[in-house]
């Protein structure tokens, strides 16, 4: 279990998410990359502002044999068809299978690309267009390494066209 603030959408067909993992340098051991390469899967779990302190604590450098679930007060939820645990009760649970691993020479980080295999969310969070409303799930967004905020709907636009101005949705 680790706090990763750098997940991003990479494609829809197949559904892909990517993330950047920090390098294993200095005195801090980093087990996330090793675990991902070994198990070839991971879960992405949304959390509310009420759980931000617990989630932030997962970024502490725990020893390899220490469960961050136990140390940070989360309960693990295992699904029969998936090889990584989810956070029990998380309103947004995404399970990814490792598809590509790219070490980045520029700064020693690693880009991990996964294909979404499991997606669970409250049906009330699905918008009419099929997208998900993070604010309806009460989820937080992470800014940088240490700031947690709640998103709101903001502005949405139809796909841009060269022949017309932006069209609000």
Question: Residue locations for each model-derived region?
Answer:
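Basic, polyanion-binding surface patches
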Residues: 1-169
């Amino acid at each position: 279990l680790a706090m990763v603030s750098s997940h991003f959408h990479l494609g829809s067909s197949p559904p892909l998410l990517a993330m950047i993992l920090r390098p294993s340098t200095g005195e801090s051991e980093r087990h996330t990359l090793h675990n991902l390469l070994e198990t070839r899967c991971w879960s992405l779990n949304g959390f509310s502002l009420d759980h931000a302190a617990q989630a932030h604590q997962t970024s502490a450098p725990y020893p390899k044999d220490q469960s961050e679930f136990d140390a940070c007060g989360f309960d693990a939820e295992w699904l029969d068809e998936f090889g990584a645990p989810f956070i029990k009760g998380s309103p947004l649970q995404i399970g990814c299978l490792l598809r590509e691993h790219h070490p980045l020479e520029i700064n020693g980080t690693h880009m991990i690309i996964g294909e979404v295999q499991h997606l669970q969310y409250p049906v009330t969070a699905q918008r009419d267009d099929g997208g998900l409303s993070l604010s309806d799930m009460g989820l937080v967004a992470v800014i940088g390494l240490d700031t947690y905020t709640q998103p709101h709907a903001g502005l949405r636009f139809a796909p841009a066209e060269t022949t017309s101005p932006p069209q609000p949705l």
